[in-house]
Structure formats: C-alpha cells, structure tokens
Amino acid sequence: MVRTDAFFTENNINLVKKNPLHFDVNLFSSKSNAKDNDIKTFKDVLINSITDVNKSQLNVSKVTEQAILKPSSIDVHDVVIAMSKANMNLSILKAVVERGVKAYQDIINIR
C-alpha cells in the first residue's frame, strides 16, 4: 500500500511523497526539479497553485487581446478553452481555500 506521510514541525505540516504517481506537487508547477522524497509544505503547494492560477488568468487576457487585435491569428475555440481552463483553475483553488478555512475554523472551535 502506497502512503503519503505527514509530519509536523512547529507551524508547518510537511508531506513526504512516497510514490511518484501519487500526490504530484509538480502537477501545477512549471518547475520539475523535485525529487521523489522532497519535502513540500502545504504553504508552498498552495502558493505555487495560486501562482499558476494567476498565470492562467493572465493567459486569458493575452489570448483575448490577441483575438481582438488580430482575429485571424487565433481561433475562437482557443479563447474559449483558455477561459474555461482559467475558470476551472480558479473554481478549484477557491474550493480548496474555502475547505482550508472551514477546517481551520473547525479546529479552532474544538473544545
């Protein structure tokens, strides 16, 4: 059975990747220099995800501007696909942040 182990240090939860097929932290990151047992904090993964969502939003702006200024240089479906990807990325990130906030509130309310 393959597991992803976690251990706690001060205020950080560190995750250890046990299998390269599971919990790929480079899924949203353009940097592929991670090794199999690299330790990434939740904060690092979240910040990388936010950065990638921002890049997808900026890509939509660029593609839309290109479609307006040079309509023959880009297909309409490429614009729609870029918008859909950015919307999906933002929706997923929003859901993760909301769940994280709810989990934090639940932990705080435990007495």
From Swiss-Prot:
GO cellular component: bacterial-type flagellum basal body
Subcellular location per the Swiss-Prot or TrEMBL entry: Bacterial flagellum basal body
GO molecular function, one term: structural molecule activity
Domain of life the protein comes from: Bacteria
UniProt KW keywords: Bacterial flagellum
Gene Ontology terms describing biological process: bacterial-type flagellum-dependent cell motility
Family, per entry: Belongs to the FliE family.
HAMAP family membership: FliE (MF_00724)
Protein name listed in UniProt: Flagellar hook-basal body complex protein FliE
Organism: Borreliella burgdorferi (strain ATCC 35210 / DSM 4680 / CIP 102532 / B31) (Borrelia burgdorferi)
UniProt gene name: fliE
